[in-house]
Amino acid sequence: MTRVLTGVLVLSLSESDFNRLADDALEEISLAVETKLDDQVEVELQEGVLTVDMADGGRYHINKHAPNQQIWLSSPKSGAWHFACSAPGAPWVSTRDADTSLGELLRDEIGAATGVYLELTL
């Protein structure tokens, strides 16, 4: 089954498939941030919630939201975002702007703040 969000066709996944995809995405972000920015940020990933505390005091809060099959992001730069997966292996795409993916948004915002641009496949 599929759904359409802001012009983006997204999958309706089984609960286990959604959790696997969302957990993989959160793990990828956590690993990339820890690897590239370990001395500049504090990272914590617990039970589907990823928190990234920036040196400038900003905090990224990223979590999976199973009822809507989305990943939600709270950004100190751009506010609240919701992302849905259009297909396994595809980027997590914004539900408000189909041209914005979770990986691109994090790469650009964290890169602008730190000078280090993350390589994310999300």
Where are these regions (language model features)?
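N-terminal intrinsically disordered, cationic/polar leader segments
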Residues: V10-L122
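N-terminal mitochondrial targeting presequence
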Residues: M1-L11
